[in-house]
């Protein structure tokens, strides 16, 4: 892994609730970047959206952060960061990226320290921060008034994207349809999930509301938390469903 560029992957979203598909995005993206021979993924960050995002059926951020922490108990490289969810208001994605980039700079400066014996080349390379998303997010860049062009350009030019394809999406076309994405496509990495994976948080919420099993769609610890906290449940639908959902 010598001379590879270190990378931190950041995923923003509702995580309402976090699913196994969210975790797979990180694994697929890491494999793809490693296979290029140029990058070494050193960390993954999950950033649940602020409560003021106003999305329908969005449970409180402290629950979503707690569920993400439980889901990541078995991961040695992905963590949840509550900063975005703890802000006074909803934060645009580019502002979340800026925050974590500043944190990387601060962390790197502290690690290097004022050591006069170190030459610049001897210092560890500053990790690149890249936004991790599904192809559905790439498609939303074309939605009128949803993203500012200046923000899209900053994301793809300064940071970069790692986009994991999902069935029913054509990321290459989304890029070719956007002058900004086309200009900076060298900084957009398209990874393909070889396993058909159609788990969505929307489906999970619907299944929970109808008292259906979500076992194997979510980490077991998350299912237990949802049951114990009574989240996404209508009319006591967990009754008679057993402890594992």
From Swiss-Prot:
Subcellular location: Mitochondrion
Pathway of action: Cofactor biosynthesis; NAD(+) biosynthesis; NAD(+) from nicotinamide D-ribonucleotide: step 1/1; Cofactor biosynthesis; NAD(+) biosynthesis; deamido-NAD(+) from nicotinate D-ribonucleotide: step 1/1
Gene: Nmnat3
One MF term in the entry's GO annotations: protein folding chaperone
Residues annotated for NAD(+) binding in this entry: 14-15, 90, 93, 134, 136, 146-147, 166, 197
Family: Belongs to the eukaryotic NMN adenylyltransferase family.
GO cellular component, one term: axon
Residue positions binding ATP: 22, 56, 139, 202-205
Keyword tags: ATP-binding, Mitochondrion, NAD, Nucleotide-binding, Nucleotidyltransferase, Pyridine nucleotide biosynthesis, Transferase
Species whose genome carries this gene: Mus musculus (Mouse)
Self-association state and partner proteins as the record states: Homotetramer.
Record-given protein name: Nicotinamide/nicotinic acid mononucleotide adenylyltransferase 3
PANTHER family, per the entry: NICOTINAMIDE MONONUCLEOTIDE ADENYLYLTRANSFERASE, NICOTINAMIDE_NICOTINIC ACID MONONUCLEOTIDE ADENYLYLTRANSFERASE 3
Catalytic activity: beta-nicotinamide D-ribonucleotide + ATP + H(+) = diphosphate + NAD(+); nicotinate beta-D-ribonucleotide + ATP + H(+) = deamido-NAD(+) + diphosphate
Function, as annotated: Catalyzes the formation of NAD(+) from nicotinamide mononucleotide (NMN) and ATP. Can also use the deamidated form; nicotinic acid mononucleotide (NaMN) as substrate with the same efficiency. Can use triazofurin monophosphate (TrMP) as substrate. Can also use GTP and ITP as nucleotide donors. Also catalyzes the reverse reaction, i.e. the pyrophosphorolytic cleavage of NAD(+). For the pyrophosphorolytic activity, can use NAD(+), NADH, NaAD, nicotinic acid adenine dinucleotide phosphate (NHD), nicotinamide guanine dinucleotide (NGD) as substrates.
EC number(s) on file: 2.7.7.1, 2.7.7.18
């Amino acid at each position: 892994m010598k001379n590879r560029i270190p990378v931190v992957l950041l995923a923003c979203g509702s995580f309402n609730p976090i699913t196994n598909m969210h975790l797979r995005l990180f694994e697929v993206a890491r494999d793809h970047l490693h296979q290029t021979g140029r990058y070494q993924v050193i960390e993954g960050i999950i950033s649940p959206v602020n409560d003021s995002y106003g999305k329908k059926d969005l449970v409180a951020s402290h629950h979503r952060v707690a569920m993400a922490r439980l889901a990541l108990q078995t991961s040695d490289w992905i963590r949840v960061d509550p900063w975005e969810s703890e802000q006074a208001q909803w934060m645009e994605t580019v502002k979340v990226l800026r925050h974590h980039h500043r944190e990387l700079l601060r962390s790197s400066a502290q690690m290097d320290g004022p050591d006069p014996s170190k030459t610049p080349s001897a210092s560890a390379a500053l990790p690149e921060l890249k936004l991790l998303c599904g192809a559905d997010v790439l498609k939303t860049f074309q939605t009128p008034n949803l993203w500012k062009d200046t923000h899209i350009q900053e994301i793809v030019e300064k940071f970069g994207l790692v986009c994991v394809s999902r069935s029913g999406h054509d990321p290459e076309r989304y890029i070719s349809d956007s002058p900004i994405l086309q200009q900076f496509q060298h900084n957009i990495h398209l990874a393909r999930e070889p396993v058909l994976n159609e788990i969505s948080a929307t489906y999970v919420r619907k299944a929970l509301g109808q008292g259906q099993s979500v076992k194997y769609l979510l980490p077991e610890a998350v299912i237990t938390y949802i049951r114990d906290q009574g989240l996404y449940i209508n009319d006591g639908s967990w009754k008679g469903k057993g402890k594992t959902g």
